[in-house]
From Swiss-Prot:
CDD domains (UniProt xref): AGPR_1_C, AGPR_1_N
Reactions that this protein is recorded to catalyse: N-acetyl-L-glutamate 5-semialdehyde + phosphate + NADP(+) = N-acetyl-L-glutamyl 5-phosphate + NADPH + H(+)
Subcellular location: Cytoplasm
Domain of life: Bacteria
Name of the gene encoding the protein in the UniProt record: argC
Example of a GO cellular component annotation carried by this entry: cytoplasm
Alphabetical UniProt keywords: Amino-acid biosynthesis, Arginine biosynthesis, Cytoplasm, NADP, Oxidoreductase
SMART domains: Semialdhyde_dh
Record's protein name: N-acetyl-gamma-glutamyl-phosphate reductase
Record family assignment: Belongs to the NAGSA dehydrogenase family. Type 1 subfamily.
GO molecular function: N-acetyl-gamma-glutamyl-phosphate reductase activity; NAD binding; NADP+ binding
Function description: Catalyzes the NADPH-dependent reduction of N-acetyl-5-glutamyl phosphate to yield N-acetyl-L-glutamate 5-semialdehyde.
Active-site annotation: C148
Length: 338
């Protein structure tokens, strides 16, 4: 169906992509890069990944096969220049960094701490949550894959349907993440598993880059006046998974059965699971899957929504494959369900 090139295939998300691609036969990975691992084979680096072709890692600057779809799993500053380069060369591109998600340049540069020299490409990117932007993704040549925390918040709120119009413009989010989603791609020892074992802490309070992402896309899809988002991420002593608790307020108490609304909104969504009670939401139920589990509870005007996903799958590589399937006309669930 499609030839795939993965730049940054030696990182956590890159490895997860290789695992997912190894489980299907319609897309073919033809090119992988990692400056640190150049010259080594997949089996040398990831012996647990059973891949049809034992590809050799190339350097980032090596020539990418002409007709391949390019997946960028590289640092933010690399994606700024790489995405336009490959688009201009005729490639379809999926960018897993955050530098093509936000449409306000000042806010983007503030939260990502860089100068964005290719901001004119922002409007070309489709935000890659398939459950919201499926029709646009089918015709996209450039997809900005969403953040893991952002997916866990934006999608549950979107599934409230028309009730979003009754929400007050203030959203409080408390998210817990394993180390692979909270900085595990960096060499910062503060995010290593040894530093969090028997430990627990908050980080990037009121400064996390997914906060403006949540604000922008909840606003654009809900009709809320520009919502205030108070987002606090925490670092769990586990490897993978995100659990988010989202507190919302309605102008007046909704009379509808909210679980039924979620169930109806997600009726044809293969990766959304609605559970009857928030207490049923657990990381172990979503780890190594592309599922997003959601539940909620209401008291008066207050609504508490709980969601969970695997940050490396639905929060990154799995959602990227879901988008690739849509972009190439493949079955959306290809490589993502048993």
């Amino acid at each position: 169906m499609a030839e795939i090139s993965i730049l940054g295939a030696g990182g956590l998300t890159g490895k997860e992509l290789l695992l997912l691609f190894s489980r299907q036969k319609e897309h073919e990975v033809v090119h992988i890069t990692s400056d640190k691992l150049a010259g080594k084979t997949i089996s040398e680096v990831f012996p647990e990944v059973s891949f049809p072709k034992n590809l050799v890692f190339k350097k980032h600057e090596d020539i990418v096969p002409l007709k391949s779809l390019v997946v960028l799993a590289v640092p933010n500053e690399v994606s700024v220049e790489s995405a336009p380069k490959f688009l201009d060369a005729g490639h379809k591109v999926i960018d897993l960094s955050g530098v093509y998600r936000l449409h306000n340049q000042e806010i983007l540069e503030k939260y990502y701490k860089l100068k964005h020299t290719r901001f004119n490409y922002i409007n070309r990117a489709v935000f890659g949550i398939p459950e919201i932007f499926r029709d646009q993704l089918k015709n996209a040549d450039f997809v900005s894959n969403p953040g893991c925390f952002s997916t866990s918040v934006i999608l549950p709120i979107f599934l409230l349907g028309q009730l979003r119009k009754n929400l007050r413009p203030r959203i409080i989010v408390d998210s817990k993440s394993g180390v692979s989603g909270a900085g595990g791609r960096t060499e910062d020892s503060g995010y290593s598993y040894t530093s969090v074992y028997e430990n627990f802490r908050a980080y990037k309070i009121l400064s996390h880059q997914h906060e403006p992402e949540i604000r922008e896309y909840v606003y654009s899809k809900s009709g809320l006046s520009d919502p205030e988002v108070i987002f606090t991420p925490h670092l769990l002593p586990v490897y993978r998974g995100i659990l988010s608790t989202i507190v919302l307020e309605f102008d007046s108490e909704p009379e509808q059965d909210l679980i039924s609304i979620l169930e109806n909104s997600s009726l044809n969504e293969p990766f959304i699971r609605i559970l009857k009670t928030p207490e049923e939401i657990e990381l172990k139920k979503v780890q190594h899957t592309n599922f997003l589990d959601i539940s909620l509870r209401k008291r008066g005007n207050t609504l508490v929504v709980v969601s969970a996903l695997d940050n490396l799958v639905k929060g990154a590589a799995g959602q990227a494959l879901q988008n690739i399937n849509l972009m190439t006309g493949a079955k959306e669930t290809l490589g993502l369900l048993p």
